[in-house]
Amino acid sequence: GKLSGISKVLRAIAKFFKGVGKARKQFKEASDLDKNQ
C-alpha cells in the first residue's frame, strides 16, 4: 500500500545521507592530512 512506498523512500533517503556523511568524513580526514604535511 501507500505506507510501504513511503518507508521505501525513507529508507533510500537514509541510505543516501549515510553515504554523504561517510564521504564528508573521508574528505575531512583527507584535508586534515593535507594540512599536517
Curated annotation (Swiss-Prot):
Its main location: secreted. It is found in: Secreted. Expressed by the venom gland. GO terms for molecular function: toxin activity. The keyword 4Fe-4S does not apply. Coiled coil: none annotated. It comes from the Eukaryota. It holds the Pfam family Antimicrobial_3. One of its GO terms (biological process) is symbiont-mediated hemolysis of host erythrocyte. Keywords: Antibiotic, Antimicrobial, Cytolysis, Hemolysis, Secreted, Toxin. One of its GO terms (cellular component) is extracellular region. The keyword GTP-binding does not apply. InterPro entries: Antimicrobial_3 (IPR012522). Belongs to the cationic peptide 02 (oxyopinin-2) family. Disrupts biological membranes, particularly those rich in phosphocholine. Has antimicrobial activity against Gram-negative bacterium E.coli, Gram-positive bacteria B.subtilis and S.aureus, and hemolytic activity against sheep, pig and guinea pig red blood cells. Has insecticidal activity against S.frugiperda ovarian cells by opening non-selective ion channels. Enhances the insecticidal activity of spider venom neurotoxic peptides. This is M-oxotoxin-Ot2c.
